[in-house]
């Protein structure tokens, strides 16, 4: 069976942690930020982990 190809768009957006979880960046912080509070924009800069519901799907894209 041939090797699975990595989904390049996913590879650029997600990073695997040492424990095998996936890190991602938050959305809604790139533009239209004038109406958002400074606290909200600051919290959007932080990364977070991918939810368990999405892990199986993303694991297939990043073998």
UniProtKB/Swiss-Prot annotation:
InterPro entries: Ribosomal_bL35 (IPR001706), Ribosomal_bL35-like (IPR021137), Ribosomal_bL35_CS (IPR018265), Ribosomal_bL35_sf (IPR037229). PROSITE patterns: RIBOSOMAL_L35. GO terms for biological process: translation. Keywords: Ribonucleoprotein, Ribosomal protein. GO terms for cellular component: cytosolic large ribosomal subunit. The keyword Metal-binding does not apply. GO terms for molecular function: structural constituent of ribosome. Pfam families: Ribosomal_L35p. PANTHER family: 54S RIBOSOMAL PROTEIN BL35M, LARGE RIBOSOMAL SUBUNIT PROTEIN BL35M. Belongs to the bacterial ribosomal protein bL35 family. This is Large ribosomal subunit protein bL35. It comes from Finegoldia magna (strain ATCC 29328 / DSM 20472 / WAL 2508). The gene is rpmI.
